[in-house]
């Protein structure tokens, strides 16, 4: 974030936790941990920046805030997790695994818009195309994920999916993995 972005973040309230649930991100986590004196959380097996310590996010373990639980992918090449917030019928917070990038926005160049459209990025209730290529996930994880009760999804890529996230992602899991 630039200075204006940091000011906007500060205006939202106190940053107490920096949570890394996706292996393909987090290069600036140490900056935010230091700036805010925040607790750093990662999935087991994720690298931790030098000079930073991290608490481990594990299903059934300690979590960054009350009313939160952790889902861990067990059949991927890199660690990845999803947080489930027990509010409003269940809210999933995902990084790269679940995406809801419906259309490209004004920040896409024409070239990237064409490339990413061709790669299958702009799909409602999607599994991240690059994440799929890198991680080669298995259906067993999505069968487990499908068992979670959730109505909404906040994905690291795309718009919030409200009210029908459980049904829409379940249909995607069935289409891609037969579960």
Q: How would you describe each model-predicted region?
A:
Residues 29-30, 70-72, 80-81:
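Short helix-to-loop capping/linker segments positioned immediately adjacent to catalytic or ligand/cofactor-binding
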Residues 6-64:
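Active-site HxH/HxHxD metal-binding segment of metal-dependent hydrolases
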Residues 1, 76-177:
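Metallo-beta-lactamase
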Residues 62-73:
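Short Pro/Gly-enriched beta-strand edge/turn motifs at strand-loop
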Residues 24, 74-75:
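Short, glycine/acidic-rich beta->alpha junctions
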Residues 61-63, 175-178:
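Short, structured secondary-structure boundary patches
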